[in-house]
Amino acid sequence: MKIKHYPGKAVDASLSLEGSSAMGALYEANWLRAANQPAAPATTGTKLSRQSSSAGSSFLIEGISALSKYQMTLENIRQLELQSRDKRIASTIKELSGYRPSALQHHQQQQMHNVWVAEDQDQEHEELEDASEGKEKLASIQEPPAVNHYVLDPTERPRVPRPRQQFSVKPPSLRRSQTMSQPPSYATLRSPPKIKENLSKSSSAYSTFSSAAEDSQDQVVICQQPQRLMAPPPREPPPEPPKRVSKPLSRSQTSVQRYATVRMPNQTTSFSRSVVRSRDSTASQRRLSLEQAIEGLKLEGEKAVRQKSPQISPAASSNGSSKDLNGEGFCIPRPRLIVPVHTYARRRRTGNLKEQSSGGQEEEAEKGKGWKDFYVLSQDRHSSFYINRIGQNYDYDYPINFNIFSPDGRVEVSREGKYLSTLSGAKVLGELAILYNCQRTATITAITECNLWAIERQCFQTIMMRTGLIRQAEYSDFLKSVPIFKDLAEDTLIKISDVLEETHYQRGDYIVRQGARGDTFFIISKGKVRVTIKQQDTQEEKFIRMLGKGDFFGEKALQGDDLRTANIICESADGVSCLVIDRETFNQLISNLDEIKHRYDDEGAMERRKINEEFRDINLTDLRVIATLGVGGFGRVELVQTNGDSSRSFALKQMKKSQIVETRQQQHIMSEKEIMGEANCQFIVKLFKTFKDKKYLYMLMESCLGGELWTILRDKGNFDDSTTRFYTACVVEAFDYLHSRNIIYRDLKPENLLLNERGYVKLVDFGFAKKLQTGRKTWTFCGTPEYVAPEVILNRGHDISADYWSLGVLMFELLTGTPPFTGSDPMRTYNIILKGIDAIEFPRNITRNASNLIKKLCRDNPAERLGYQRGGISEIQKHKWFDGFYWWGLQNCTLEPPIKPAVKSVVDTTNFDDYPPDPEGPPPDDVTGWDKDF
C-alpha cells in the first residue's frame, strides 16, 4: 500500500491546521464566510452544466461528513464553496472540540502563493477567436492551452475579480517542520484563461477548486502553493456579466503532456502541466484509464521526469472520489504521527506484546481488531494510526521512499517539542508497530514531500506465519519420503525440518564428489542434478540417472558411512537448491523421547483428587482477607485464611472481569486456570479452587511467603555460582514437568519466581502459558522484552525451545544482576537480542562452564538449544556446570536451599511490600457469560 504524505507541521489533538496546508485555507475561508455572511442553507444539489454529454451530470450534495467531525471530504468542501453563504458551517465547526482555524489569528504577513489569474475578457475572447495566434502566444510562455471548456451555468455566481497582488520570490521564514513544497493535487482550475509567464499574481484563491473526478473533460491541472487566506470584507454581489461561451481549441493546437518543476530558494514548488493530444471525439477515448495510469507509474517510477500524465476514467469519477494526476486518491492532509512512546522501567512490563488491546488471542490467524470512529490524534497509538480514511485503524511500519518531485524526502524526529534528528533516504520508521501495540516514543513530521511504503502489523504477521507453516509442511513431506525418516514421530520430523539449511549451487557445480568424505545429507528442493560414477578402468564418468525436486542423496552419511560413492553434479540452468542436514545435528535430534514425555503421566493423579475433595465445600464467603501480597494488571493478590482455621493461609488472586474483557484476555485467563488446575509439581504454585461473581474472578492458590526472587536479587546485587545453580535447577524441574506435557511457559523472569517458607522456588503467573499440539508452534508475541527469543521477534513461530532461551537469560541475570540483552527501549533491546549471545561480553565472575551453558541455551537456532535436542532437558542436567549437583535431593525437597527466608508465621507478610487499597473502587458488573466454565 503506497501512502502519500504531504509536507507541513504535525497537527496536534485540537486539529489546528497550518497555513502551509491548502485544506487549512479552505477551512478558514469557509468558516469566516459562514460567520460573516448568513444565508439560508441549501438542501439540494447544484448541477454543473458541461458541454460534453459524455461526461454526464455531476451533483454535489452540501453537508458535513457524518463519518468524522474533524474533516470534510473534498466534495463537501467544494459544495461549500458553491454555497458559500451557509450559516450552518460556523455552528458545525464550533462544535468541534477545541477547533479553531489557525488563520483566525490574523497574521500580518501573507504567505507566498502561486495562482493563475484570469485575464481581461476582451483579451481572452480575442485569443479564442484566433486559435493559431493563441497557440503562438501560449508557446511563447511554454504553457499549454486548456481543453476543458464549458458553458457557464446562469444560476452560478460569477467570480468577482480581486486586485492582483505581487509576491516575492523569497519565501517567508520557515520553521524546521514547514516547507513550501506542494503536491499536484490540491487545486484545479475549472475555466483557466490565458496563462501569463508572470506567476506572481493572486485572485480569489480556493474559490475555484475542482476535483479531477468532477471535471470529466480533459483539463489543465495546476499545483498551487497553499497559503493562509485573509478573510475579505463582505461585499454586495455585482451584476451578472453576459454569458460567455468558450470555443474548443483544435487538435493542432494541443501539445504533448509533460511535467515541469520550478525550484525556488529554500523551497520546492512543483507545477504540473498537462495537455492530451486528442485523437478521438469522445472524452472516454481521450482519457487514460486508472489502470493505465497505475501501470504507467510502475514503468516510469524510476525516472526523474515522467513523460505521461494519466487522467482519471469516468468510472473512477463516478465513485465520488477525486483523483490527482498520479492516479492516486486525493487525500485531505492528515497528521503525520508515526512512532510510539513506550513506558519503560526496571520493573519490567510483561504482556501480550503483539496486541495489548486484543489480549493476544492465540488463534493462528487472528482477525483485525476493527476500527473506532475517532481521529488518530485522540488516541496516538500504533493500532489506530490514521492512513487512508477516517474510521480505519492500521498498524504500519514505515520505510521512507523517494518521491519523484522530491528526491530528498526528509522527515523530522522530535520528542516533547524538542528536535532530535532528520531522517532521509531508505530509513524505516515505526518498527515496533509490526511487533506489538505500544505508545509512541517520538513524533515524526514530514518536512518535504515523501512517499511512504506501509505494511500493516496483521498483514506482516500473517505472512510470516503462513510462510513458516508452508515451509514446515513442505520440508516434512520431503523427510517422509526418505526411508530412514518415514517411521519417525511427527514432532521429530518437525524438529529436523527446523534445522534444515537451504544451499544453492550453480550449473556444473559438483555437489558431491566420488571418493570424498562427507557427513551431510541432501534433499533437492529445486532443480535437477546428474548422477555419475567414475569407472576405474577408463576414468570416464558414466551417467547413472537424473534426480529432481523431492529426491535425496547422501543418506548413508547420517548412518556413519562417510565415503561418497558417486558424483552429484548440478544440471539445471537456473541452479539447484538443496536442503542440508549434517550428521551431528541429526544425531542430536533423533532419539526415543517416549520415556521422557510420559514420565509424569500417572504422577500426582491421586494427590489432585485429594485436593479437589478437600476444597470442594469451601466458598468465597468462608475466606477473610489478612493483607495484600501484590498488585497485578487485572487486580490484586490477597493473603486470606478460612474461617475457623488459622493454621494455614492462602493467596487469593482476584481479577476484574470487566478489565479482562476490555483487554480481550479471556482465553489466557481460561488457559491459566486449566493449566494450573491440572498441574501437580512441587516447583509450580498449586491452584486449589476458583470462584467468580459479577465483578471478579478468584483463584485460591498456595501462598509463598518467602517473597519474590527478584526482591532478594535486588538486595544482594547478584548471586554466586552455587546459589544460581540451585534456583536454575528449580526452574529446570518446573520446565521438565511442563514441557513433558507440551506446555510452553513464556514468562520466565525473577519477578515470577516465588520462594516458599523453606526457600524453594516455585513458578507463578501462568497467564501466557499455552498447551501446544505435538510438533506445532504458536505465533503470539508475548513475554518480557529482555527475555524474548529471536524467533518470537522475527515472527517465525516458537515452541518450548523459547523457554530454554529465557532460562539462559535468567542464569545470566542471576549471576550478574542484569539481563544480557538490555537497551534503553524495547527496539534497542530486540536489536541486541538479534545480534546473538556471542556479541555479549561476559563478566569475569561468570565461570567458563556457566558461560558455556548460557551460550548453549541461547543459541539463535531453536533446534540447537540445549534441552531441545536428543536427550531433552536431561542434557541440561548433565552439563558440566551441574556436575556434583544433588538432583535427587532437589526433587525430594531434601536439599538445603542457599537462602532461607525469614517467615515467622502463616500470616507474616514482611517479605512483601505494602500496598494501599484499590483507588479505583469496585469495577462494573460483567454478565456476558464468557466465564461460565471458570
Swiss-Prot record:
Belongs to the protein kinase superfamily. AGC Ser/Thr protein kinase family. cGMP subfamily. Its EC number is 2.7.11.12. Residues 883-934 form the AGC-kinase C-terminal domain. Residues 623-882 form the Protein kinase domain. GO terms for biological process: feeding behavior; habituation; larval feeding behavior; larval locomotory behavior; long-term memory; motor neuron axon guidance; protein phosphorylation; receptor guanylyl cyclase signaling pathway. The keyword Kinase applies. The gene is for. Residues 121-287, 301-327, 910-934 are annotated as: Disordered. Residues 200-213 have a biased composition (Low complexity). It comes from the Eukaryota. GO terms for cellular component: cytoplasm; cytosol; plasma membrane. It catalyses: L-seryl-[protein] + ATP = O-phospho-L-seryl-[protein] + ADP + H(+); L-threonyl-[protein] + ATP = O-phospho-L-threonyl-[protein] + ADP + H(+). SMART domains: cNMP (SM00100), S_TK_X (SM00133), S_TKc (SM00220). It holds the Pfam family Pkinase. Keywords: ATP-binding, cGMP, cGMP-binding, Kinase, Nucleotide-binding, Serine/threonine-protein kinase, Transferase. GO terms for molecular function: ATP binding; cGMP binding; cGMP-dependent protein kinase activity; protein serine kinase activity. It is an enzyme of class 2 (transferase). 3',5'-cyclic GMP 2 binds at residues 545, 554-557, 564-565. SUPFAM superfamilies: cAMP-binding domain-like, Protein kinase-like (PK-like). ATP binds at residues 629-637, 653. This is cGMP-dependent protein kinase, isozyme 2 forms cD5/T2. The active site is at residue 747. Residues 121-131 have a biased composition (Acidic residues). 3',5'-cyclic GMP 1 binds at residues 430-433, 440-441.
